[in-house]
Amino acid sequence: PVSYYMDLNYTLIIDPKLDFDGSVYYIAYYKELEGLEGVGSTKELALKDLKQVKKDWFRLSLKIGAVIPEPQTKEELNEHSD
């Protein structure tokens, strides 16, 4: 079920970006879920957007039988950082 995946602790990254007019906005994404992004004028709004995108993507992935990656463990993250 979607709730199982929503409760997993994916590696969250939130990066500030500069818009063409010089204003700051934020892009939020999970390291393990390539292609999913949330965007907002604040970190909180970017995260809120990302959570909705993630939920929709999980629903669709489960419906079509796609593989959903699970979060990396701390050990796996350390192995890939060398």
Place the predicted regions along the sequence by residue.
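Short, charged, surface-exposed hinge/linker loops at domain edges
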Residues: P1-I13, E44, K48-D82
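Short aromatic-glycine-(Arg/Gly/Cys) micro-motifs in beta-strand/loop hairpins
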Residues: I14-E34
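A short, exposed loop/beta-hairpin motif centered on an aromatic-Gly-Thr core
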Residues: E34-L45
